[in-house]
Curated annotation (Swiss-Prot):
PANTHER family: ATP SYNTHASE SUBUNIT B (PTHR33445:SF1), ATP SYNTHASE SUBUNIT B', CHLOROPLASTIC (PTHR33445). It comes from Roseiflexus castenholzii (strain DSM 13941 / HLO8). It is a single-pass membrane protein. Belongs to the ATPase B chain family. One of its GO terms (molecular function) is proton-transporting ATP synthase activity, rotational mechanism. The chain crosses the membrane at residues 9-29. Its main location: membrane. F-type ATPases have 2 components, F(1) - the catalytic core - and F(0) - the membrane proton channel. F(1) has five subunits: alpha(3), beta(3), gamma(1), delta(1), epsilon(1). F(0) has four main subunits: a(1), b(2) and c(10-14). The alpha and beta chains form an alternating ring which encloses part of the gamma chain. F(1) is attached to F(0) by a central stalk formed by the gamma and epsilon chains, while a peripheral stalk is formed by the delta and b chains. It is found in: Cell membrane. This is ATP synthase subunit b. InterPro entries: ATP_synth_B-like_membr_sf, ATP_synth_b/b'su_bac/chlpt, ATP_synth_F0_bsu_bac, ATP_synthase_B_chain. CDD domains: ATP-synt_Fo_b. Keywords: ATP synthesis, Cell membrane, CF(0), Hydrogen ion transport, Ion transport, Membrane, Transmembrane, Transmembrane helix, Transport.
Length: 163
């Protein structure tokens, strides 16, 4: 191979040098870079997994939030319906009480009016009785006087016949 210009000593030295450089590059450059790339890949993978977990947690939280919101809306609607029902019942009770009060006032007023009517009738009867007695007294006095005058005249006339 010397005819070809190959120097075996130099070729072996160069081969050793290449193997040594490959070993050096592999040991001090390729493996650390490969390790760094693997670590970075792992961190990216963990970040993606964390992001996926966070996305799932966020989806679960949103689902829970939506469920709680729906439940709260339902409870609010129920509370509102109950409040409206209580308000209707109270309004009905207030109206019924007002009707009862109005009826009581009406009956009290009618009773007072009847009492006043009875009192006035009693006073009227008393006054009428007084007027009847007074009128009867006057009539009787007038009749007695007329009868008395007539009797006196008749007696005088009778006496005049005897005279």
């Amino acid at each position: 191979m010397e005819k070809l210009g190959i120097n075996w000593g130099l070729l072996i030295a160069q081969l050793i040098n290449v193997v040594f450089v490959v070993w050096l590059l592999t040991t001090f450059l390729y493996r650390p870079i490969l390790n760094m790339l693997n670590q970075r890949t792992n961190r990216i993978q963990e970040g993606l997994q964390d992001a996926e977990r966070v996305r799932e947690q966020l989806a679960n939280a949103k689902r829970d939030y939506d469920a709680e919101l729906a439940k709260a809306r339902q409870e609010a609607a129920s509370i509102l319906a109950q409040a409206q029902e209580r308000a209707r019942a109270q309004a009905a009770e207030i109206i019924a009480q007002a009707h009862r009060d109005a009826e009581k006032i009406k009956s009290d007023t009618l009773a007072q009016a009847e009492q006043e009517r009875q009192r006035m009738l009693g006073e009227l009867k008393d006054r009428m009785a007084e007027l009847v007695v007074l009128t009867a007294e006057r009539v009787l006095n007038a009749e007695l006087k007329a009868n008395h005058d007539r009797l006196i005249e008749e007696s005088l006339a009778e006496l005049g016949k005897y005279n």
